[in-house]
């Protein structure tokens, strides 16, 4: 009887560990159903932040925002965890200069489906603005230093 309970408990532990309950995310990262997110308060250029995200988690990249729901999730995550007075937070959107026009892409290689951008300047990188509660994307100089959000598959 004790052996059956022990085996049953062991199978339950294995099942729960394989069920994708958020345990698939790196320690201290936040998750939705499919992705893991982390707000880093290191001040990096866009390129440095993009490289850093690839080193933090398997399949990691600067955050791509694919829906209004994900935009709200990311904005809330930043607002709850903000530890700096920076005006912007880097996201993974950037303009690829391909003659004769620009093509906006995410660092994970995906195309832009959902868009909430205000292009005030002729710049190639994008960030979320503090004044809009991190809900609107602005194009910025890629060489500026800001905190950033990384995203990886769960």
From Swiss-Prot:
Instruction: Output the InterPro entries linked to this UniProt entry.
Output: C-type_lectin-like (IPR001304), C-type_lectin-like/link_sf (IPR016186), C-type_lectin/snaclec_domain (IPR050111), C-type_lectin_CS (IPR018378), CTDL_fold (IPR016187)
Question: Where on the tree of life does the source sit, at the highest rank?
Answer: Eukaryota
Q: Which UniProt keywords apply?
A: Disulfide bond, Glycoprotein, Secreted, Signal
Query: What S-S linkages are listed for this chain?
Result: 25-36, 53-150, 125-142
Alphabetical GO CC annotations of the entry are:
extracellular region
Q: Where does it live in the cell?
A: Secreted
Which residues are in the C-type lectin domain?
Answer: 32-151
Report whether NAD shows up as a keyword of the record. no
Residues carrying a glycan: 139
Protein purpose: Inhibits human breast cancer cells (MDA-MB231) migration and proliferation, as well as their adhesion to fibrinogen and fibronectin. This inhibition may be due to the binding to receptors of the integrin family, probably alpha-v/beta-3 (ITGAV/ITGB3) (40% inhibition of cell adhesion) and alpha-5/beta-1 (ITGA5/ITGB1) (by comparison with lebectin).
Name of the protein: Snaclec lebecin subunit beta
Tell me which species this is from: Macrovipera lebetinus (Levantine viper)
